[in-house]
């Protein structure tokens, strides 16, 4: 596109520029520079206007907006530079983009109209709102039996172990067609500000396109009855599948699902205002289950912390969000099937990518994503 009129040598010059990628920085402001070049000089002034347009980067928060700014090449000038102010922060996030749109060409042809500016994230700190519901530190009739407040710089080897890989060869895709490779420390497990953070990334590793982490207390901490409180912030993007769940320490009644599975909390990342609580049981080979959900109104589980709880006693399990009861499952509900939940279980925390429940990532999926735990407390 261009404006008719003679240039140097009787031809109108072409305006060219390249997309730009710059480090965002971790404090204050910086500058991104876009070089605009004419393929030959013009005997007349050349003018264009330029404006910024939001992408995933937002004006005010990530850069300073420009609207309709005039840029002039004087006669025989062939290069000009546009400078846009970039607002830096120290928060780890996905790379972000905005556009600089060129318009109203006079005495010049535009070979393209838009420059894409990519702000490459180079930060290490993960941002989150340290607000939300906080559970009581005591309950009538219960005493604190075990807790992990995640105040250290690494996972307690006394309480936890890692599961790594993709489940192969015995349980490829972890039995759910998941797409991630779970790494051993320190790749995807981060400790910051008294929180444990599992980071899911879009990166090639172990033959997979995504990495994340999965930890368990198997053989180290087992639980039977009581109340479990877990305070967490959940991720929000299509294909993410965070889970807080329990499996039996011993398969007393046979292989899964006959010996049971208790899902304290599962979330489908594309539905960030809803969580699921589920009891899986036999007779197999597929699961028979009772599942119910809890939804927030006008908010998501990514906005701030919420507390996911189980109240577990002989022949009955109750599920809570922020101490609001939303599901009760009792022995009578499983009918003639075995009630497998009067045994010792261990805890698993993981952040899956893809799988049967959330589906695969698509163009709307943003990485990295985080499952952030403040504490786990077990009362008996």
Residue ranges of model-derived segments:
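Intrinsically disordered, low-complexity segments used for protein-protein interactions
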Residues: 1-2, 240
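Short boundary segments that mark the start of a structured unit
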Residues: 2, 8-127
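Small/flexible residues
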Residues: 3, 82-83, 94, 103, ...
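GH16 jelly-roll
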Residues: 109, 121-380
């Amino acid at each position: 596109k261009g404006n008719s009129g003679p240039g140097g040598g009787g031809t109108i010059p072409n305006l060219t520029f390249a997309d730009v990628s710059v480090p965002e920085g971790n404090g204050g402001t910086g500058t991104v520079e876009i070089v605009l070049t004419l393929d030959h000089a013009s005997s007349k002034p050349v003018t264009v206007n330029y404006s910024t347009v939001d992408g995933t980067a937002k004006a005010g928060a990530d850069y300073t907006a420009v609207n309709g700014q005039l840029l002039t090449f004087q006669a025989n000038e062939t290069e000009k530079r546009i400078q846009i102010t970039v607002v830096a922060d120290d928060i780890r996030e996905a790379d972000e983009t905005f556009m600089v749109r060129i318009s109203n060409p006079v005495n010049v042809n535009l070979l393209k109209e838009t420059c894409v500016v990519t702000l490459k994230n180079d930060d290490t700190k993960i941002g989150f709102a340290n607000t939300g519901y906080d559970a009581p530190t005591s309950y009538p009739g219960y005493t604190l039996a075990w807790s992990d407040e995640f105040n250290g710089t690494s996972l307690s080897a006394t309480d936890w172990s890692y599961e790594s890989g993709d489940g192969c060869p015995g349980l490829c895709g972890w039995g759910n067609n998941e797409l991630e490779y779970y790494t051993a420390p320190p790749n995807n497990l981060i400790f910051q500000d008294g929180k444990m953070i599992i980071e899911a990334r879009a990166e090639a590793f172990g033959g997979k396109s995504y990495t994340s982490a999965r930890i368990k207390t198997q053989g180290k901490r087992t639980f039977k009855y009581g109340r479990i409180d877990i305070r967490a912030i959940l991720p929000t993007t299509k294909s993410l599948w965070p889970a807080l769940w329990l499996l039996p320490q011993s398969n007393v009644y046979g292989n899964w699902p006959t010996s049971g599975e208790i899902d304290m909390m599962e979330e489908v990342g594309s539905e960030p205002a809803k969580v699921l609580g589920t009891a899986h049981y036999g007779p197999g080979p597929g699961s028979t289950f009772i599942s119910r959900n809890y939804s927030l109104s006008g908010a998501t589980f990514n906005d701030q912390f919420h507390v996911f709880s189980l109240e577990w006693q002989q022949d009955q399990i109750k599920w809570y969000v922020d101490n609001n009861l939303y599901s009760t499952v009792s022995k009578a509900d499983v009918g003639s099937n075995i009630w497998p939940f009067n045994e010792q279980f261990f805890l698993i925390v993981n952040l899956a990518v893809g799988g049967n429940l959330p589906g695969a990532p698509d163009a709307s999926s943003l990485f990295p994503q985080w499952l952030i735990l403040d504490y786990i407390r077990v009362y008996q």
